[in-house]
Amino acid sequence: VEAAGIVDVFVKFISTTESEGVINNNKLVPELYKFSYLTGRGSSRKGSITYKDNIPIRLTAEPNYDDSEIPSLEFLEEYGSTSNDPYSALLVHGSYSDPCKFIAQGFDGLRSFKTIFVRAAREEKIKIGEQEVVTSKCIGYFDPMVGYKESDFLDEISKPGSVRYWFKYFDSLDLWAPVKVIIDTPLGGFVLKGTALKN
């Protein structure tokens, strides 16, 4: 993931993530989450969250977090047991006929949030590469639960309508996955968009 558009002028970063897990009883169950990032200012970090029985049991990072930031096992269990990692939280199981009815909860070991959609899905065609794709568009907002500092950014993404997802259903996976995401920020829209699709 890279910052794009006007946001890239002010916020330069590159992020790489990897998420592993299984589907059990129509639910995504995380097992391992790996992440790394590099900012335009030269700061970087890589790390992972290890899960056991759908509960995060260990957060490791290099460089490590400050002692005051390192979460306790109780904190990990409280906010992680009902959550997914931030990227598998983007996915919706195919048992939902409307992905907008799903309330996602993401947790990165330090911060927890919900993604809440405010209306039913509406069909919309978009271009992914050279392919025209029929999607289900969801409009909503982020509900920060713990770990976030007050900021203009937080105020912006908490407004209803500040988050737009374009979901496509993938038959082979029985999953809805967003092929395009726009998040409003004080600096403009932050855009994530697929470059090619395989079903």
What are these regions (language model features)?
Residues 53-114:
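Active-site/ligand-binding surface loops and adjacent short beta/alpha elements
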Residues 1-51, 98-199:
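Acidic, serine/threonine-rich low-complexity disordered tracts
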